[in-house]
């Protein structure tokens, strides 16, 4: 049996931060982008929104409610907004890449020009717990408000700034190619090879004695960019 979840995806129970409002008055997470990984939300409960930015269509906001689903490509800057008890199942392609550097938080051009300052802000949750996560979120939102202002006042400047940010992230990720390739080879690519082997083997049986995995509920949530995370990553055979 392959390790991890089907097709090498990641599943995470996400409760978007609602402990206190951000500088713009909203309960929300950090705006951030992924370099190579697609992401999706399936809403379990509550209501909110996801704000999306890309170079083709600019800014838009999609409402979220129980049963709704949204999927977006890498390079899409996104922020989750919690209006009332928003809890989602976050689905990530290429499980493990986000933890290995695939994501970058929006802190504005001044921080992007200072790698050490970026690392300091990134580490706040590890150093200060929940308060550090909220402090990091607040710093992100303060900068993100300027991007929203550009969208309203100067679309050309907005696209220039968004393009700059995505470019910074892509250049930062380039040295991590081998690390990313290893994750994909051991995850999605291995699942693809297994599926093709099963097809080649038909009509022989593909049953396996270790074909059932179980992930128990529990454990302390992790402090993520969007909120409190409970990833499904501890599996046992049953």
For the regions a protein language model found, what residue spans apply to each?
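Conserved short histidine dyad/triad with adjacent acidic residue
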Residues: 13-35
């Amino acid at each position: 049996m392959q390790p991890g979840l089907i097709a090498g995806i990641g599943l995470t129970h996400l409760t978007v931060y609602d402990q206190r409002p951000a500088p713009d008055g909203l309960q929300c997470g950090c705006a951030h982008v992924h370099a190579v990984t697609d992401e999706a939300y399936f809403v379990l409960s509550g209501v909110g929104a996801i704000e999306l930015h890309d170079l083709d269509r600019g800014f838009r906001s999609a409402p979220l409610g129980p049963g709704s689903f949204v999927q977006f490509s890498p390079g899409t800057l996104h922020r989750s907004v919690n209006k009332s008890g928003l809890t989602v199942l976050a689905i990530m392609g290429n499980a493990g890449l986000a933890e290995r550097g695939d994501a970058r938080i929006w802190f504005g051009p001044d921080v992007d020009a200072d790698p050490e300052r970026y690392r300091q802000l990134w580490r706040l949750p590890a150093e200060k717990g929940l308060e550090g996560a909220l402090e990091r979120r607040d710093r992100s939102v303060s900068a993100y408000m300027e991007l929203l202002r550009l969208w309203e006042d100067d679309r050309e400047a907005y696209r220039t700034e968004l393009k700059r940010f995505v470019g910074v992230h892509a250049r930062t990720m380039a040295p991590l190619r081998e690390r990313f390739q290893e994750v994909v080879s051991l995850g999605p690519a291995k699942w693809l090879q297994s599926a093709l082997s099963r097809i080649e083997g038909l009509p022989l049986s593909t049953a396996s004695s270790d074909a059932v995995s179980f992930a128990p509920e529990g454990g302390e949530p992790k402090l993520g960019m969007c909120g409190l995370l409970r990833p499904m990553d501890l599996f046992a055979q049953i």
